Regions:
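C-terminal helical cap(s) of enzyme catalytic domains, especially alpha/beta-barrels
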Residues: 234-250
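Alpha/beta enzyme core
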Residues: 86-96, 105, 110, 122-177, ...
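Glycine-rich, positively charged N-terminal anion/phosphate-binding segment
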Residues: 1-5, 10, 19-94
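Glycine-rich phosphate-binding active-site loops on the catalytic face of alpha/beta enzymes
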Residues: 100, 172, 222-238
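Glycine-rich beta-to-alpha transition loops that act as phosphate-gripper elements at the mouths
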Residues: 20-21, 74, 142-147, 200-211, ...
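Hydrophobic faces of well-ordered beta-strands that scaffold small-molecule active sites
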Residues: 14-17, 39-41, 69-73, 96, ...
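Catalytic cores of alpha/beta
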Residues: 83-87, 151-156, 207-223
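Conserved small/polar residues in nucleotide/adenosyl-binding loops
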Residues: 297-302
């Protein structure tokens, strides 16, 4: 069993990563139905929450069938992060997560997300401000460092643990890599092997198959795995990994009917959540994802 504060997860839990414009309630619900053990919301701007921005507030929507679930916040100001943690607390998630890993320029330029990777002292202050502002368990998601020449995840892990965080998810790339190249889990393994590290360490990056998930578990010794892009349009990946781990066998690929049903449920739940017009418009971007790598046959014309 893996513990995050008062949250109990199964051995080697599978986490759904927070993804902007992806990890909304309808998609999270699909992933939960298909084996995700812990999920996170899309990241939410601390400044947006304080301004009571509609988009930011809407991202606070969570539902009991999703639990355990964490709400992820980002920002570069200590006071704003503390205030946003208190706002998050009002909707009663299971935990609060801090984003120190988003590499997108518009976030980094605000001194948030991966923008703080060059200033560990600031990371510590921001984290401490959140930990001290909430009774909920606080976790962090980050990257190896700013670039190859400034990998500092070992220092970051120890210092953030000292602030009181309850778990750390590490993406195996630097900010400079964005999502290019390959993730390097050797640094994640080194953090996990550090005798001073007592909190759960979750690995993230390039897990796209049951074989790779189990290979990385055995090779790098992480407590669990966080899955992001590989779950887009394929929420079945969680149960596929679990089945392979338990039996050594592969589950069959989802049928056309199962893919259609997933896309249909995504649409229906989006409409229930945001209304018919918005639900339809926002779900359109997801339809094709459910049919990637799938050949669709039509009857030949007479």
């Amino acid at each position: 069993m893996v513990k995050i504060g008062n949250i109990s997860l199964p051995n080697f839990p599978l986490l759904l990563a927070p993804m902007e414009d992806v990890s909304d309630p309808p998609f999270r619900r699909l992933c939960k139905m298909n084996g995700a053990d812990l999920m996170y919301t899309e990241f939410i701007s601390s400044e947006g929450l304080i301004r009571d921005a509609i988009k930011s507030r809407k991202k606070l929507d969570i539902f009991d069938e999703e639990r355990p679930i964490g709400i992820q916040i980002f920002g570069g100001d200590e006071e704003a992060m503390a205030m946003s943690a208190k706002i998050v607390e009002t909707v009663e998630p299971d935990l609060v997560d801090i984003n120190f890993g988003c590499p997108v320029k518009k976030v980094v330029c605000k001194g948030a997300g991966a923008g703080v990777l060059k200033d560990v002292d600031l990371m510590v202050r921001l984290t401490k401000s959140v930990v001290e502002s909430t009774h909920l368990p606080v976790t962090v998601k980050t990257r190896l460092g700013w670039d190859h020449d400034s990998i500092n995840i070992d220092e970051v892990a120890e210092r953030l643990q000292e602030t009181g965080i309850k778990a750390l998810a590490i993406h195996g790339r630097t900010r400079a890599q964005m999502y290019k190249g390959h993730s390097d889990w050797s640094h994640i393994a080194r953090v996990k092997a550090n005798p001073n590290i007592e909190i759960p360490i979750f690995g993230n990056g390039d897990i796209d198959s049951p074989q790779k998930a189990i290979e990385f578990k055995e090779k790098y010794g992480v407590d669990g795995i966080m899955i992001g892009r590989a779950a887009i349009g394929h929420p079945w990946i969680f149960n596929k990994i679990k089945h392979y781990r338990e039996t050594g066998e592969f589950l069959p690929e989802p049928t056309i009917q199962e893919r259609v049903e997933a896309a249909r449920n995504h649409l229906l739940w989006a409409m229930e959540w945001k209304g018919e017009r918005t639900g339809i418009l926002e779900t359109r971007m997801h339809y094709t994802n459910y049919f990637k790598g799938c050949l669709l046959y039509t009857s030949p014309s007479p």
